[in-house]
Amino acid sequence: MMTLLSTAAAQTTENPFFQNYNTPHQTIPFHLIKNEHYLPAFQEGIRQQEQEVEAIINNPQSPTFKNTIEALEYSGMLLEKVGAPFFNLLSAETNDELQEIAQQVSPLLTEHSNSIFLNDKLFKKVKIVYDKREKLKLNTEQKRLLEKTYESFVNNGANLSDADKETFRQLTKELNLLTLQYGQNVLKETNQYNLLIRDKNLLAGLPEDALKTLAENAEKAGKEGWLLDLKVTHYVPVMKYADNRDLRRELYLAYSSRCMKGGEYDNREIIRKIVNTRLKIAQLLGYQTYADYVLTRRMAEKTENVYHLLDQLLEAYRPEALREYEDIQHFADENNAYFKVQAWDWAYYSEKLKAEKFAVSDELLRPYFQLENVKKGVFGLAERLYGIRFIKNPKIPVYHPEVEAYEVTDRNGKFLAVLYTDFHPRDGKRAGAWMSEFKGQWKEGKKDSRPQIVIVMNFTRPTESKPALLTFDEVTTFLHEFGHSLHGMLSDCTYPSLSGTNVYRDFVELPSQIMENWASQKEFLDQFAFHYQTGEKIPVELIQKIKDAENFNVGYSCLRQLGFGYLDMAWHTLSSPFEGDVVDFEKQTVAKTQILPYVENTAISPTFNHIFSGGYAAGYYSYKWAEVLDADAFSVFEKNGIFDQATAQSFMENILKKGGTEHPMILYKRFRGHEPSIDALLRRNGIISTNN
C-alpha cells in the first residue's frame, strides 16, 4: 500500500496542483501531473478548505449571505482543482495505482465533507442567515443558493445529536468505500473475460468491420485469431450479427452473470451492504426510505409520483412490447429457428427483421456516419442553433493521445469553454458514454470562470482500411452527450454549485435527450452524412427508412428501461434491512416488465453501476422522466422549425444558461408555457395517434 504523504512533502514546487497553470485558458497540464501528485494535493486542499471554514466560523461580524453563504460556496477551490481531474481519469484512464489512491482518498473526502456539514458552529451561522431570508434583499439565484446550502446541511445530518452525527460519519464513510468497490469490481470482472476464436467460421454473420476489430484486439494481446471480450463495442456486434447461436449464448451468459459467481468480484453482498447502509442513513435523518430522502431534491418529489409515471408507461407500452415479441418469434420461426426466442436471440433476430422490414441496418448506415463528419455535423448544429463555434487547439494538453481539445466561442468570438472529446474504448476506460467537467463555470466579482468540459464515448475504432464509422445509435449517443456538454458550456450562473449540470437529477437529462431528436432529421443529416468512399449524400429514401424504423421495438425498449427504473425504486423503497437473495429479489421486481423468458443465474443488479456507484440511486426513473420532458419540449421545434432561432434562443436562455438557479419546473414552464404531459412521447412513439 502507498503511505500517506505528509503535508510538508506536498508543498513542493514540483506538484502542478500548487501552481497557476501556464496553459491555454489555464487548462489542466496533464503532461506534468503524476500519480504521486494527487494525494498531497487532496490533503492540502482539505487543509485549505478547513482554514476557510474556520475563518467563516471565527468571523466576529454577524452572519450575512456574503460572509457565510457566499464564503462557503467559494471555499475549497484547490480541492476541486485536484478532484475533478482525478475522478474523471478514474473513469476514463484508470490504472491500479489510481484505484489504490481512490481507496485512500475516498474516506478522507467523506470525513472532510462530514466535518463541514456536521459542524455545529458553521451550521448555526448558516441557519441564522436562512431564518432571516425573507428580510434579506436576495435575488433569485442567491435565494436558491441559500436554500440549497441549508438543505444540504440538514440532509447531511446537521440537525442530528452528537451521537447520531458520529453514526452518520461512519455510515457515509462506509457507503463511499462500498460504492467505490462495487464499481471497481464491475470494471475488473468485465476486463477479465476474453474468448479467443481461431476458426473464422464460428464468427459467420459478423460484418467485416467487426471482424477486423476483433482481429486487432487479438493482435494487441499477442494472439492469433479473433479475441472477444465484454467491452460493449465487441459484445454488441456478436449479439446482433453472429449466426452461431451457441456463441451468442456463451457471451450473453458471461456478460449477464458478471459479479455474481462467487469470486473476488462478486457484488451481491456489497449490494446488501449498500442498500442497508443507505437505509440507515435515510432513517437516521428521519425518512422512511432512502428514496424518500433522495426525492426531496428531485422534480418528482415523492415516490408516488415516480411510480405513477412508471405505471402509466408500463400500461401504455406493455401491449406493444408483447406484439413485438410475437413478431420476432414469428420471424424466427419463418427462418427455421425451431425454438422459443431467448435473451441471446433477441438482438440477432431484431436486427434481421429490422433490415427486412425497413431495408435498413447498422451496416447499411455506417458508411454515411464517418466519425469526423458526424463531429462536424454536431458542432455545426450547435453553431446553427446557438451561434457557438469550435476551434481545435493542439496546444491544450490532453490526458491521452486520442483526446482532442477545442476552444468554444460565441458568434462574436467571445471565449465560452474548452471541450475535450474522447471517442474510443481502451483498457482503463469504463464502458458507456458520459459528460463531465474538469472545471465548472462561476462568477466572482468581474471574473467569469469559464468551464472545461469532457465528453467520453466508446465508439468503434478505425481500422487499417476504414475510418471510424458509427452506427445510428452511436450518432444518437454523440448528440446525447453533446447535449450535456452544451448545458455545461453555455452556463451563465454566479455560483459553481448552481451552474451547468448542477440541477436535479430528473432534469439533467433534458438538454441531452432533446438533442437526440435531430438524429433523424433530414435537414440535419444533409449537412454531414456523406458516404466515406464516394462522397454521396445520404439518400432521402434511407433517411425515411431511419424515421420509419425509429419506433421499431419501442415497446421492448421502454419496458427494459422501466425494468431498470422499477428495480432501482425497489432497492431504495425498502423500509427494513434487506437480508434476502439479491437475484430472487430482482427477479420478482422486474417480472412485470419482462417479455423474454427468464435466464437462470443472470441478473442486472450486480453490474448496475448507475444506482450502486454512479449517483442514480432512486433516480434511474429520471431517464423516462426526461424523455417525457424532451418529447414535449421538442414538439415546439417541430411546430416552429428544427432550426428556428427564436425557439433555440428561448431554450438556451431558459434552460441551458440557467443551470440550477431556479426550480426546474419553473424554468421548463417558462420555455414551454405549461407543465409537461406524456402525450407528446406517446405520439412520437406511435402509441397514440398524432391526431390525439
How would you describe each model-predicted region?
Residues M77-N88, E147, E151, L253, ...:
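Short, hydrophobic/amphipathic alpha-helical patches that form generic packing surfaces
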Residues T460-L479:
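Short pre-active-site segment immediately N-terminal to the catalytic Zn-binding motif
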Residues M1-T13:
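Bacterial Sec-dependent N-terminal signal peptides
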Residues T12-P207, K212-T213, F637:
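N-terminal helix-rich structural modules
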Residues N22-H37, F86-V105, I128-Q170, D229-E269, ...:
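Short His/Asp/Glu-rich catalytic/ion-coordination signatures at enzyme active sites or charged loops
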Residues L145, L177, Q184, K188-D229, ...:
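Active-site-proximal, well-structured secondary-structure segments within enzyme catalytic domains
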